[in-house]
Swiss-Prot record:
Domain GIY-YIG: 13-91
Gene that specifies this protein: uvrC
Main location: cytoplasm
GO cellular component, one term: cytoplasm
Family: Belongs to the UvrC family.
Gene3D superfamilies: 5' to 3' exonuclease, C-terminal subdomain, GIY-YIG endonuclease, UVR domain, UvrC, RNAse H endonuclease domain
Name of the protein this chain belongs to: UvrABC system protein C
Pfam families on file: GIY-YIG, HHH_5, UVR, UvrC_RNaseH, UvrC_RNaseH_dom
Keywords of this entry: Cytoplasm, DNA damage, DNA excision, DNA repair, Excision nuclease, SOS response
Species of the source: Haemophilus influenzae (strain PittEE)
Subunit details: Interacts with UvrB in an incision complex.
UVR domain mapped to chain residues: 201-236
Function, in words: The UvrABC repair system catalyzes the recognition and processing of DNA lesions. UvrC both incises the 5' and 3' sides of the lesion. The N-terminal half is responsible for the 3' incision and the C-terminal half is responsible for the 5' incision.
Cellular compartments annotated: Cytoplasm
Length: 609
């Protein structure tokens, strides 16, 4: 039993962070305090504030502390530790993806494109957008309104005539001389920039002025083009919510909670425009106070490595926060400008908050129904296989084109559904092209020839294939030399049936040495189809990326001595990949940074491709 009195005797009254551990030396809770001694003493009073705290204290084996120079520093360290340890008694944001932006590049002929990651390229970034779909929708809209290129530089640099986008009026073809002047092109770029900044009226005023000027000059064809563009922009503006207020950059958050499940709805507003909304379902320990949930979510959302999320000027929440001022100060320090958290708003901000609340409740209801269906399907599969419980399932699939660029996928499901953070892909090498058996064997070896923690050992492993694939998998497990219990997983083959149609799958159960044909309406079959389809899609997407990479590689990547800078110089000075391939030895040697010896290597390599 934890001797808290002895522990507290050595704790100081300084600010800092504390980590609580269980008897397995796992971090079960991370917290911070302005006064560590006072805060930690509160856990060991007779009357605790909640059942959650009671359960936490009962699990404590030992505690360690780390002093910080300020409470703000402690708050930041707390969120970093939560991300690192994922303690079961903390609220956990289960979303680790970076957010997409729209990038307007800084070039002679700028392009508009989607971008995800650190802002390392020169240009202007607009966003973040809640998901890739919102970016694609905005890019499609911009293409219809402003004929600014969206193509990659490798395409732009190697055009000899305009592409289809020019033919359908969605690009002005700056790639080919004589179609649009730099001045005309940059006018459209500026209009796109203003539109992304939410300055719609400036866009309209400019276009109306240009239309009237063209009419005065009797250039009625040009005036008609401006008229059509004005109508298109007005049509878009009319569909958007028009606020009487000048809204700042802000995120609006609302929380709905029911039956142990929480939904945080975040609405993103930038430059006065609603970029979209997104639902988050953080892992919430039982009996967690919703104000604590809001506070923890805000901290994790903006502070845990940022994940490409820009911190807005204002964050609107629908709960009172106990540590609002500390959180504001930390976000202000991170953003390098004043950031406020608002708990009470009026006007259009209040309308947006109400909208976020409605969306949070609706998304929570959908999630609850999905969770209920998932639970029913899990129980049906348990009954089918005579298993008391299934905590973790993994499924493998193989994808290739004519035996090339072979990729294996492994997807993971727990009792809540897909566990995407544990998904994996494996590049398959050194086998005969098209040998799916060998590919499956290599994938299983890569996955399981290593130490696995107890909670990472799957109860079921699905193999997408018939008896041949399953037998190869059984052979792999027979020869595994590992410390974990390799006999625990049930290996099950999922064959597609005689007609290879959905609903006619045959399950081949290795441990029971039997085949099962399930009816179309079987809940167990629906779960198996779900995980099998996830694995199939994951394998295909990985294969497509690998195939595209192989297709777009210049051939220079494999040449020793040709790094990124030299490759870029070759493509730039010789007019792209085709120019490099057609170049003579002397022309290659004339490129800055390319010696005669290296030029000979490049010339011979490309000639023999």
């Amino acid at each position: 039993m934890f001797n808290y009195k002895k522990f507290l005797a050595d704790v100081s009254h300084e600010p800092g962070v504390y980590r609580m551990y269980d008897d397995k030396d796992q971090v079960i809770y991370v917290g911070k305090a302005k006064d560590l001694k006072k805060r930690l003493s509160s856990y060991f009073r007779k009357n605790l504030s909640s059942k959650k705290t009671e359960a936490l204290v009962a699990s404590i084996h030992h505690i360690d502390t780390m002093l910080t120079s300020s409470e703000t520093e402690a708050l930041l360290l707390e969120h970093n530790f939560i991300k690192l340890y994922q303690p079961r008694y903390n609220v956990l944001l289960r979303d680790d993806k970076s957010y997409p932006f729209i990038l307007l590049t800084k070039e002679r002929h700028p392009r508009i494109t989607s971008y995800r990651g650190s802002k390392k390229f020169a240009g202007e970034y607009f966003g973040p957008y809640p998901h890739a779909g919102a970016v694609r929708e905005t890019l499609s809209l911009l293409q219809k309104l402003f004929p600014v290129r969206q193509c990659e530089n490798s395409v732009y640099s190697n055009r000899s005539r305009p592409c289809l986008q020019y033919q359908i009026g969605r690009c002005s073809a700056p790639c080919v001389q004589g179609y649009v002047s730099d001045e005309e092109y940059n006018q459209q770029v500026e209009l796109a920039r203003l539109f992304l900044q939410g300055k719609d009226q400036l866009v309209l005023d400019y276009l109306i002025g240009k239309m009237e000027q063209a009419s005065r000059n009797l250039d009625f064809e040009q005036a008609a083009r401006y008229r059509d563009q004005i109508q298109a922009v007005r049509s878009v503006i009319e569909k958007q919510f028009v606020s009487n207020e000048r809204l700042d950059d802000m995120d609006i958050m609302s929380i709905a909670y029911q039956h142990g499940l929480a939904c945080v709805q975040v609405m993103f507003i930038r430059q006065g425009k609603v970029l979209g909304n997104r639902s988050y379902f953080p892992k919430v320990p039982a009996n967690t106070d919703l104000s604590e949930l809001t506070e923890t979510f805000v901290g994790q959302f903006y502070l845990q490595g940022h994940q490409g999320r820009s911190i807005p000027n204002s964050i609107i929440v629908d709960r009172q926060l106990a540590e609002k001022s500390e959180l504001e100060q930390l976000l202000t320090d991170q953003a390098g400008r004043k950031v406020t958290i608002q708990e009470s708003v009026k006007g259009d901000k209040s309308k947006y908050l109400q909208l976020a609340q409605v969306n949070a409740k609706a998304a929570l209801n959908v999630q609850l129904k999905q969770s209920s269906r998932m639970s029913e399907r899990y129980q049906a599969l348990c009954d089918l296989l005579n298993l008391p419980e299934i905590k973790r399932m993994e499924c493998f699939d193989i994808s290739h084109t004519m035996g090339n660029q072979t990729v294996a996928s492994c997807v993971v499901f727990n009792q809540e559904g897909p566990l995407k953070s544990d998904y994996r892909r494996f590049n398959i090498e050194g086998i005969t092209g098209g040998d799916d058996y060998a590919a499956m064997e290599q994938a299983l070896q890569k996955r399981y020839e290593r130490d696995l923690e107890e909670d990472k050992i799957p109860d079921i492993i699905f193999i997408d294939g018939g008896k041949g694939q399953l037998n190869r998998a059984l052979n792999v497990f027979q020869h595994l030399q590992v410390k974990w219990d390799k006999n625990r997983p049930h290996l099950i083959g999922v064959a597609k049936g005689v007609d290879r149609r959905a609903g006619q799958e045959v399950l081949i159960i290795s441990k029971q040495e039997r085949e099962i044909h399930l009816p179309d309406d079987s809940l167990a079959l629906h779960l198996i189809q779900h995980i099998r389809d996830e694995s199939h899609n994951h394998a295909i997407s990985g294969h497509r990326k690998k195939r595209q990479k192989a297709f777009t590689q210049s051939g220079l990547e494999t040449i020793e001595g040709v790094g990124a800078k030299r490759r870029q110089a070759l493509l730039k000075y010789l007019g792209g990949l085709q120019g490099v391939k057609k170049a003579t030895l002397d022309e290659i040697a004339s490129v800055p940074g390319i010696s005669l010896k290296l030029a000979e290597t490049i010339f011979e390599t490309l000639k023999n491709d």
